[in-house]
Amino acid sequence: MAEGLYILGKESLDSDEYDTSILIHEWMHYFENKLSRSDSPGGNHALGDKLDMRVAWSEGLASAMSSAMRGNASFIDTLGARQGQSSTFSVDTQPVVSDRGFFSERSVQYAVYQLSRLQGGAAAVLQTLLAEQKNTPAATSIFSFAAGLAPRMAAGATDTVFSDIGLPSASTLDAWGGSVSYVTSFASGIPVVDQLLSGIATAPVCVSNQYGSYNKLDRNRPIRLEVPAAGKWRLVATGTAALARVDLYRTGVWQPPVNEVALAPVLENTYQLQAGTYVAMLTDASMYNGTAKPQLHSCFGVRWEKVS
């Protein structure tokens, strides 16, 4: 399929080609992909879902900028027989407590919309998208955006906005969400990103399908990996019973392994890498393949080492 914008357009079902808010939302995805950067895996999503932070960021950004560019906080989707039904929400509405956080599309759209309305905010948002967000070594999320935005805004100008969605002030946020932790059904105080400079991870790296499909929170676990010197590096993930799957990225670009050995419960991926910072996205292979049982939690011991 050729590159472009593909819009739903079936009469008496969903005629998005007449919904300005959706047209600009989809155009914003195109902008993000071509001029900024999107690490989102895509997929189905709805307001209230607990999403992979890359998905929450991309979808919330697109809705916020659609409203900002139209000068209208209302987002309207017409559908149904003779387009007689509609779904409406406002990006200007602060999310309820249970829907506040880096995993919430509603939180992201609220924050970006509010930031765009601050003095100098619209320009700062666009500049950040074209610079820091495009080039961040972290996975794209509200954290990488906030870290890039903060120096462009007056001190403290964004604090209320981030507080409204349950996050610390932008001045304390780094691109990796280092000052933030959250609670899952299997653990509390979970960091947003696991960090492994070298050697063995101090704690198991865990994933879960409790929130749903592949693009939901905790289905993929980001791990920050440092490569201080070019050469061959190996990631070993050992499960108690499950087999891991790992995809490695540098600045959003997938890095293919030169060798992969997957003999349950051990995965060994070897890479030829340049010096720099990388992000590994780890999941349970059965979750990736669609064969996992519901409400599955899997944990892995992870080791990162230089081979040669």
Predicted features, each with a name:
Residues I22, E26-K34, G60, A64:
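Catalytic glutamate of the conserved HExxH
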Residues A229-G231, G239-L243:
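Short proline/glycine-enriched turn/loop motifs at strand-loop junctions of beta-rich domains
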Residues I7-L23:
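Short pre-active-site segment immediately N-terminal to the catalytic Zn-binding motif
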Residues S15-D16, F31-E32, D39-G42, N289-T291:
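Extracytoplasmic/secreted cell-surface and envelope-processing proteins
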